[in-house]
Amino acid sequence: MSTKNALNDSQIKLLNSLNDNKGIPSTEFVEKFAESLYETQNDGSKKLSSIDGSIKSFAACLHELNRLKSRVGDRIRDYASASKQVQNEYHQKSNHLREKFAQVLELSRHLEDNVNDMRSGLVDAGQELERAENNRKRILSSAELLRYYLEFRSGKPQTLMDFFRTNNHDKMLLCAQRTRQLLALANEVDLPDSSETLARIEKFSEFLETNFLKFFNNEYRKPNWKGMASFGTILQEFNGGASVVREFVNQHEFFIAADKVQSRQGLEQDPIWLILPDPTQKIPPLIQTLSSLFSELCSVIEGDCAVIKRVFPNPELVLQTFFQRIFGQSIQNRLEEVMEIAKGKSNLAYLRTLQTVVSSLRKLVADLKTILENRGFSVSDNSPLSLALNQYMEDLLVPFIEVDDYLKREEHSLRSLFRLSLYKYTSYKIRLETPEPGLLRSLMTPLQGNMVAPTGVHSQFNTKTEGFLLRIADIQENLIQSGSFITEDYITIEKNHSHLNSEKVYSFIGWHAEALNRASILISSQDLSVVISSLVNLLDKLIREDYVFKELSSIQSYISSHDKSKNLDLHYLVDIRECKKIMGYFSAYLMSIVIPFTGVTASSRRETVNILSSSISVIECAVNDVFYATVHALGDHLEIILSPYRQISYAMTEEQIDSSTELRQSMTRNVQNYLDYIKNLYHRLGPYDPSLLALKQKTATMLAAMLISFAFRSKVTAAGALLLQNDINFFHSTLTSWGIDTVDAKFKLILQLLSLLMVKIDVLPAVMQDKRKAGFSEMNIHEVLRLRFDLPENLKLQLNKEEALLPPKSS
């Protein structure tokens, strides 16, 4: 009986789906297979219809699954066998194709070797043929040269002369080539009469060169570019083209035009000579006479580049020769005239002119390179044209830029400008408010070049031509604007001109910065560091040594020689304030401009930092010395004011108080006037000026200490304590307006402790204890307590013991 009889249709269909290779999960297969084995009950539940039937169905299913498994296994084995057979066939075909490709590759190698052998053979054959042809030509040429030589030996060079007369380019070119070769041959021949033959050949060569140049020049005048190119090529073959290049350059209308010549008088009348010597005006970007020449030159090059490139076989050589002539003649002649005029004006005019010239030349070279590049010439950094232009410019400037001469001029100019700007300061130091005769002219002359100036007390100044120098010297503007001649009698010098002036230094630093920038333009990188170092040292010497430090030393001398019985004139505090500003400008300039400056080496930077550090240290030390001397001088005068009143004693009875009233009023009035005088001076010079605040604090502290010491000069009775309190209150009120917190605190502390002098002896210990609880130190308590006239012996002994344990007070 077939197992399928135990299966229903749905189960058979399910098994057939497996046979059709439909993938069904095992769990789903079992559920679908078992669905037909259950019956649905009335309550909706399912119940196995028959156990035997179910067993038979599962047995039949298992049998079918085994049969299906066997069939699938047979198929797998069939597929594996077929796959193995296909793989074997593939390997066989692959090996066969590999062998064929190897054979083809070997044949290709043999073929390539054969081709290379053939190529090598052909090349060798070609070279042999070329050598044979060259030998044939040399033989023919040698034969021709011998024939030509014999013609010259006989004195009748008919063949070459016929070539020359044909007016045919190829024949003329052949004539030039053969003549050049013949000349070389004749120099090596050593036969009888060979010198005469050589002379005839040389004469013929000169004849050819002269006529070819004439023909070239005729074509140039037409102009006929094709004819110029023809004769240019002939001359290139004849002598390398040197003569034709010279002919072209020398005959160029740029060099022979009459309008290129400018009169010396017209050049000297250029308004630029009113600007260049004046440091207060900006440096002009160009000099008109050079600018017009450079513009015309650029136009000529832009127009002739195409002609030169079309006519000459080696246009770069022609351009180099052209530029050499331009820089070495046209520009040099014009530049020498300009610099000669500048030299006669002043060192500053010369240096500024040179700076403008160098900037203009660099722009010219850059413009020429741009023109050449646009015309198809190579102007890279290492190209012949670029190197030639740079070299011509450097050679042109060599006579004008020599490091020692430049530095000498720059230092002389800066030194002269600085001294002229301090004219009124210097004059006041010599003759107070009366100008020193001849001083202004002596300071102006170094800035006027070769100008012949009147000397002596009758010097006159032209406000039109010398106005800028008078402004530098700080002469009144109304005199300069008058446009007339003035003498030193017109000049007013006031007391305020005797002080340091930070604005003068600020202007001078600007001139120094211009010199620094000029050095970076004119001086090579190898020498720039040395030049900058020299200029910085000059700046330090002029500002610190010759100006600031000298003035501080003068102030110190004034204070030390001052009569202590008279009020100290603090006019010099203006110089302290200006000194601080000057050193601020100096420091900022070195740190922000000089040290980061391009071209400064590490050693130069260290040197600059050392200069700055040394300058600040020296000036600060000098300022502190002035402060110290000022404070002591003010204290000395206060001591003189207080000395007549030291006879006033606070150890007095109530009956004696009235007798001291008039004397005490005189003391307070004199002290009040003196302290107000000092305070008003500080206030007038600047109540919030940081450069004077430290001095004001030191002065107030010193004065307070002296007044307190004066108040504590004697023993105090209970009645005298009231007078002492009044005096301390007066001193406090006088110094309170100074706004010094430490001084104010000191007086308040003393006033709070004065009750120790007023209470009776029996309550003194209790009052002392209260002061301790209030936070007053034992030292402060004892400082006041020791003034009591009636201090008990036990407290005196205690004070002496404690005083021995305390460190000595510093002044």
UniProtKB/Swiss-Prot annotation:
It comes from the Eukaryota. Component of the exocyst complex involved in the docking of exocytic vesicles with fusion sites on the plasma membrane. Signal peptide: none annotated. The exocyst complex is composed of sec3, sec5, sec6, sec8, sec10, sec15, exo70 and exo84. Interacts with dil1. One of its GO terms (biological process) is exocytosis. Residues 106-147 form a coiled coil. This is Exocyst complex component sec10. Belongs to the SEC10 family. One of its GO terms (cellular component) is cytosol. The gene is sec10. It comes from Schizosaccharomyces pombe (strain 972 / ATCC 24843) (Fission yeast). Keywords: Coiled coil, Exocytosis, Protein transport, Transport. Gene3D superfamilies: 1.20.58.1970.
